[in-house]
Amino acid sequence: MNIDFSDPDFQYLAVDRKKLMKEQTAAFDGKKNCWVPDEKEGFASAEIQSSKGDEITVKIVADSSTRTVKKDDIQSMNPPKFEKLEDMANMTYLNEASVLYNLRSRYTSGLIYTYSGLFCIAVNPYRRLPIYTDSVIAKYRGKRKTEIPPHLFSVADNAYQNMVTDRENQSCLITGESGAGKTENTKKVIMYLAKVACAVKKKDEEASDKKEGSLEDQIIQANPVLEAYGNAKTTRNNNSSRFGKFIRIHFGPTGKIAGADIETYLLEKSRVTYQQSAERNYHIFYQICSNAIPELNDVMLVTPDSGLYSFINQGCLTVDNIDDVEEFKLCDEAFDILGFTKEEKQSMFKCTASILHMGEMKFKQRPREEQAESDGTAEAEKVAFLCGINAGDLLKALLKPKVKVGTEMVTKGQNMNQVVNSVGALAKSLYDRMFNWLVRRVNKTLDTKAKRNYYIGVLDIAGFEIFDFNSFEQLCINYTNERLQQFFNHHMFILEQEEYKKEGIAWEFIDFGMDLQMCIDLIEKPMGILSILEEECMFPKADDKSFQDKLYQNHMGKNRMFTKPGKPTRPNQGPAHFELHHYAGNVPYSITGWLEKNKDPINENVVALLGASKEPLVAELFKAPEEPAGGGKKKKGKSSAFQTISAVHRESLNKLMKNLYSTHPHFVRCIIPNELKQPGLVDAELVLHQLQCNGVLEGIRICRKGFPSRLIYSEFKQRYSILAPNAIPQGFVDGKTVSEKILAGLQMDPAEYRLGTTKVFFKAGVLGNLEEMRDERLSKIISMFQAHIRGYLIRKAYKKLQDQRIGLSVIQRNIRKWLVLRNWQWWKLYSKVKPLLSIARQEEEMKEQLKQMDKMKEDLAKTERIKKELEEQNVTLLEQKNDLFLQLQTLEDSMGDQEERVEKLIMQKADFESQIKELEERLLDEEDAAADLEGIKKKMEADNANLKKDIGDLENTLQKAEQDKAHKDNQISTLQGEISQQDEHIGKLNKEKKALEEANKKTSDSLQAEEDKCNHLNKLKAKLEQALDELEDNLEREKKVRGDVEKAKRKVEQDLKSTQENVEDLERVKRELEENVRRKEAEISSLNSKLEDEQNLVSQLQRKIKELQARIEELEEELEAERNARAKVEKQRAELNRELEELGERLDEAGGATSAQIELNKKREAELLKIRRDLEEASLQHEAQISALRKKHQDAANEMADQVDQLQKVKSKLEKDKKDLKREMDDLESQMTHNMKNKGCSEKVMKQFESQMSDLNARLEDSQRSINELQSQKSRLQAENSDLTRQLEDAEHRVSVLSKEKSQLSSQLEDARRSLEEETRARSKLQNEVRNMHADMDAIREQLEEEQESKSDVQRQLSKANNEIQQWRSKFESEGANRTEELEDQKRKLLGKLSEAEQTTEAANAKCSALEKAKSRLQQELEDMSIEVDRANASVNQMEKKQRAFDKTTAEWQAKVNSLQSELENSQKESRGYSAELYRIKASIEEYQDSIGALRRENKNLADEIHDLTDQLSEGGRSTHELDKARRRLEMEKEELQAALEEAEGALEQEEAKVMRAQLEIATVRNEIDKRIQEKEEEFDNTRRNHQRALESMQASLEAEAKGKADAMRIKKKLEQDINELEVALDASNRGKAEMEKTVKRYQQQIREMQTSIEEEQRQRDEARESYNMAERRCTLMSGEVEELRAALEQAERARKASDNELADANDRVNELTSQVSSVQGQKRKLEGDINAMQTDLDEMHGELKGADERCKKAMADAARLADELRAEQDHSNQVEKVRKNLESQVKEFQIRLDEAEASSLKGGKKMIQKLESRVHELEAELDNEQRRHAETQKNMRKADRRLKELAFQADEDRKNQERLQELIDKLNAKIKTFKRQVEEAEEIAAINLAKYRKAQHELEEAEERADTADSTLQKFRAKSRSSVSVQRSSVSVSASN
């Protein structure tokens, strides 16, 4: 880079090399110098002092303080040679600290531009720098990036050069947050392009005195105008653009500017009437109040004081560094340069001033009226004057606007708030329209009509904003920035890497985590924020609260980008309703007023008034939109009446993104250095945040790793083959080979480039080096070429001099000879006689020549006349030819249009057919729903009849109860006086109560309650009154239930009636649509026939036109030949004239005739005669040719006239057809209007439905949209009817193709019917299989009950064994050591029984292996069934596709769908039955688990007893040899028993897993229909947690094992010190070591099996999910589900049988073990050496059993979730039971009262008591019946409600299914990755534990070697152990505790 640093232009662009050398030579230690995090500076420079583990002590360079930081927090520091680096992609260490330091160091040195790979970073300097002058522009023009310091001009020049060389549109995206300097950089880019590519000025333009500037000046001066009207002061930026603009600068073929245009986006209109305290309105308001141009004050009627106007005095009035006076003058000058007239300027200023006066209009409320009135008219008159309207009309339109009610206009009163809002809306609308007009006017000036080839677009959009109060405008701005950032990320990170993959380059995809699509989808997708806002704007009663509720309902908790706002972090922060997570930060938004802002309402009366304004500009701004011409095309999308602000912004933003994607982008990232707007100050945290959000580091990384420069092979070969000409082989070679040879010839490093499929890719900077090499080679070649050219020119001049020299010598020689001959007399005579030889007969010849000349003149005139006629005819023919050619071209164009339209019509027809099919399917669904409702209605009517009957019975019962109550009241009055006598009769009452208990056992509980209540007779009266009150309450409740049932009945009847009416309307609409379709098909067929005829005519015309063209070409050739002949004759005539003149001269000189002259004259005469004859023949030929041409022309003219007549006839015929079609279209449109009205009625009726009919609403709305689309298509057809005649060939071809397809589809329909019949037969077969499954399930239930009984027997036997053990223990403790011999005998018996148990264990193992084989076989069968299900799904899918292709099969499909629906309901019922059975199976499994737990506890108790017994047996002093033998034998028996128990438990767990899988499969069928995808996510979360817990439990067990090994090592070390106490323990350790090895191997095998089972379960879940997703979309998949159920039931049956066999075996084992317990005491002496090993093994067994229990419980968690619904039903039944018990208690109280009455009145006798008792029983029975009926009624009501809710939610779930499935797939993929990562971590942990175990094993082996040395002391230990029993007992207890 050759830079003159003394040049002042580079002071703020490049660092002085002398200063930089000092900085680059500073001391540096790469191992010590580093960056550490710092709260204030972001990162601080430090030196590493020491390190300890993950913590490092560093010394801060700035203050010499020390600090301890983590190793991961330290970032590497670049060497000093990278100081103030211009391109950060060249850094050695790329990290945040280095980037921040480089930017800060350059910024503090005044260098604001830095390259960052492919884009440029610009830091706001907050001051003016002299780096944008013309001299700087000249220095950057045409320079490469590496030749000159970083600058914005370099980016602009690069874009310009790319446009010129690559012939591709370019764009400069200048992005950043608000206040980062985007607007200023945009102006500099435009200025640079205007200077570099300025067009050549004309002299007359330079000499003119007009104020209009050149095109470049106009482009530059457009910015001040737009800034005045579109920029304002905000809290972060004094000159913030409150609108977005995309400036396109167009260039011509030569690279010169050919024009420009500006597109604007989203002007912030709300700022016109409201600003925050620290902000300002738009600059133009303060400029017109600055008194900069005093003469305008009178025009605008403004006072030069901005504080007087309420619209602009809400914030600050002045801004630092902005002079409103000077800015207004610049703005006025810019208007002049842009060509605005004085009238246009004044009109704009008037409109601007009128907005100020609108803000001063005052209104007040009339007392006691809802009407406002004007509080003064001065400001209104000013507004009216400036806008050119009447003040009274303006006030009237504001205060009393007219609204249309029906067909009449009614005056509406406005209150004060409404009027003020209307004025504000008018001001905002006026300003918005004026701004848009200003942009259009500027574009008109910048449009030069010159030829445009390419353009460079410069984008300046309002930056990302986070204010204290963020509203709708901030959402739109931030949404735009989100899209632009996504474009940057996609272009930089995604497209770049995708191109590598596409080109076949070896590249590993890098995910930078910069995808913003989730946030964008949240805003713009259907049911996103903007979509919900637009939907709410269409509802008249919608408000901010309803909008907020919809947002929360759709997104809160469902999208992590949408959250509730946190607590305000700033004191001035306004209230917020939700918070979005944007790429630049979290922004809280307030939705207050969003609906009004989005609808942008305005008073239509004022609009109409302003449209008729006297001011031309105001009238133009508010003129009514022009109606489209009749038959013209209508715009797609919403009409202008419904075009909301969000929809317009989204449409314009999509257009902008489309433009950007079509260009080659260049990015400039603007950075805010600090919030204080101070130059030279860098806020590290703020800058780092912007770098992270903008993807700066990621952009640098991909620039360094990737290959940003690329060229296609042809361009590379053409441009760089000059560098290696010898490397290119001769002949044809493909571009890739040539490029590879060129690169090889240049000896380039292969790491610097890659060869793709079509392009060659280079690392950053490599292409610049190639350009430099090319320039050097070109300079050498040019120098050689210049040398060759100069040599050639010199040689050519030398040769010319030689030729001149030869010519001079020849001339000199001839002159010398002439000088010799000139005095010779014979020469003189010769020279005199020679002229006289040709003078003979000159006069005669002259006369003849004159005659010939006259004749030739006549012929020539005649020929000229004929020539003119022919030329005129030729011109006429050419014109006709051109007309015909134009007509042909028009016909061809219209044919192309018609072809497209025919294709669209065919597609539309297909769409309509599919829509009709969908409507028919929906009608079928609705008919099914109506049928269901009819059944429900009938059932409810029957229930109502029963209820009426029951209510009548209850009323009779209540009447009787009331009579009884009156009677009982009388009795109570008598009882109150006799309470004291009741104590004597208590015994008698008790005896009678016992007799009643014997008589009726059912009332035993109630009699017991009566005995209890007899003790509280003093409370009898209150209790009886309470019972009566409860009866009355029950009666009221029953009445209320009856009323509710009646209401529900009436409502259901009404709903059913309206549904039937809707169905009838839909059927009628369907029939009409079918009739229209048939009519249209007939019309199309007629049109096709017409088109065929006209096609033949057109083909004939085309052939004739081609013949005429050939004839015309022949005529043109003949005319050309005639012209050539005429020219030849003219030339001959001129030569003859010249010869005649020469003859005349010679005759004059000769004066006489000689014989020679006479002979010569004869020859001349003969020649003249010959010439004359030739002329006559030529004239005759010409005349013949002319006559032939005339004839041909006449024939051609006649043919053309005939063709024109035929075309006129065709035209008239087509116009007639057009009128007929138009009339038919009008009829069809009227019919569609009628259909629309019917549809509206249907919608009104449908809105009356409850939530169960919401799916009908959605479908009807779809139908309405399809009808609207049909209408729009019809309107387009009206405009396109005139061009239908030109679609003949394609229409004919398509008709033939359609006929073929129709025949093919008809054959496919027959195949589909046959396959459907086969499917029906298969379905019936499956139904039979399901019935068989029911029978199998009953058998399974019975077997489970039997297993439960056997389990209870086992438990009883175990309890008996425990009792026996306790007895033996107590007996042993009493008898002591005297029973040792008996224990030995019993031990031998126990050994025999243990051998038998070993045999049973082997048998159990064999059974387990058989079960495993059965499991694998069942798994294979399950996979086969899933394949069959997939095949069935595919066939059903194919049949559904075929079904949609035909209308004729609709009725057949309806019947089939109805049958499928009934089958689906039956399957659902069966599924519910299966679920109930599975609940019972689950209960049995829980009981099994309890029994297993009991067995485990019993096992532990036995082990404890053995432990105690061995402790006691240690006192016996038996021999070590016998103990060793017994220990080994028992150890083997224990291992075998434990293995058998583990295998049995594993088999049981497998069977439980099988049962659970079957249960989950059946439950998933119902859950998939009810709960859909959410349930699946919960299942996968549970599965993930279960697997995680399982892995954790295995890890814990391994860790516990390692810990146990460590404890064992400590114990061994302690026992080595005391060898006498360690002999038995060492043997146990040796045995324990072998056991541990086996245990570890077993654990490893279990881990592998667990992993395999996890993967297998995951695969099975994926397969099940796929099948269930298919079941959701197609009801016919129920056949596949039934097959799965059958397979599951068969598997459950096999599992049940296997478990039954295993249970029987287990029972046998338990019986054997129970019989063996009696012999345990005899074997206690030989169990002493096994205590420690058995205790360890038992602990491990317990750990494994606990893990198995946990896994089983986790597997049961899903089943427990399914039981929640059953529990809810049980709770409800409990409540009903409570009510029943209350009634029973009342009956009991009646019984007590009867007893008391009987006791108190002995006179009544037993007859009265019996009568009362019978009455009580009757009441009790009636109450029970009533409660039962009430419960049935409630159950039926719940079923009906559940069915209605299912119908309501089904449609919504189907619509959302696809999106949820996609999200679920993504989530599941992420979860699978997480699971894999967790499994890998678990494997690593297992490997670590295995290493620990091996280490422990090694230590154990060493301990064994040491133990061998202790054998010599074994005899001493035996003698010592016999003498000291107490020492042995203590040692054994210590080892047992360890």
Curated annotation (Swiss-Prot):
Presence of keyword Cell membrane: no
Residues of the IQ domain: 778-805
Domain named Myosin motor: residues: 83-775
Low complexity bias: start-end ranges: 1922-1938
A Pfam family the protein falls into: Myosin_N
Coiled coil: 836-1938
Binding, ATP: G176, E177, S178, G179, A180, G181, K182, T183
Biased composition (Polar residues): 1265-1285
Localization in the cell: Cytoplasm, Myofibril
Region annotation Actin-binding: where it falls in the sequence: 653-675
Region spans: Disordered: 1041-1062, 1187-1332, 1344-1363, 1898-1938
Record's keyword terms, sorted: Actin-binding, ATP-binding, Calmodulin-binding, Coiled coil, Cytoplasm, Motor protein, Muscle protein, Myosin, Nucleotide-binding, Thick filament
Residues covered by the Myosin N-terminal SH3-like domain: 29-79
Basic and acidic residues compositional bias, start-end: 1041-1058, 1212-1225, 1286-1303, 1310-1332, 1344-1354
Renumbered residue ranges of the record's region Rodlike tail (S2 and LMM domains): 836-1938
Quaternary data: Muscle myosin is a hexameric protein that consists of 2 heavy chain subunits (MHC), 2 alkali light chain subunits (MLC) and 2 regulatory light chain subunits (MLC-2).
Protein family: Belongs to the TRAFAC class myosin-kinesin ATPase superfamily. Myosin family.
Protein name (record): Myosin heavy chain, striated muscle
Organism phylogeny: Eukaryota, Metazoa, Spiralia, Lophotrochozoa, Mollusca
